[in-house]
Amino acid sequence: SGISAEGNINMLTQLIQHQKVVLGEPLEVSGEITSVDPVPRGHRISTSVWFRNISGEAMISVHRVSLKPDLSLKAERGAGDRPEPVVPDVGALRRARTYQLTPESTKAYSREGNAIHYELEAAQKAGFRAPIIGGGQGVHFLTAEIWEQGIASLDFSVYFRRPLLWDQSLWLGVDPHLQSMAL
């Protein structure tokens, strides 16, 4: 496709666990870029990845939308329509976990593929004070709370409202019915 993940900023991840996956179970992975659309700040890229068991049954599907910024464009906003807040009152959430992000843990999670997650110069060139955690790392923080509930299947979307820098403190808030969460 000629499209690199370098510099991309995750805006949305939809994670579908079709059925329970057993740790160590062999899975086949396939994926595709489903669309590339111009937006005022660059391109909006949609991708889909599937994890199937050896019988070909879908176990997990991941659909993502990301912004590939074009640094020559000067638009303040412009990655497409911004969804309404998923959590209108963050103060109503129960504090489930607290995380202290560190450069070391972020580098350990994202060592290759997109330098804005592990190189200060690349992050600053993209307009960030420091490297940002990868979308997968953010999803990991959210799903850790869900997996402890022993859920066999799920379908949820993660909206990335702002970047999380590799040296920030953050907390995970959960509504009482596990209908929404926020970092």
PLM region descriptions:
Residues 43, 62-64, 107-115, 133-135, ...:
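Generic hydrophobic/packing signal
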Residues 8-10, 53, 114:
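Detector for Asparagine
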Residues 12-98, 164-166, 171-183:
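HotDog/MaoC-like acyl-thioester-processing domains
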Residues 1-8, 14, 125, 129-152:
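Active-site helix/loop of acyl-thioester processing domains in fatty-acid/polyketide metabolism
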Residues 1, 68-133, 147:
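Catalytic strand-loop segment that frames the active site of acyl-thioester-processing enzymes
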Residues 145-175:
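A conserved acidic, glycine/proline-rich C-terminal tail/linker
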Residues 2-7, 23, 35-39, 117-118, ...:
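Intrinsically disordered, low-complexity segments enriched in polar/charged residues with Gly/Pro
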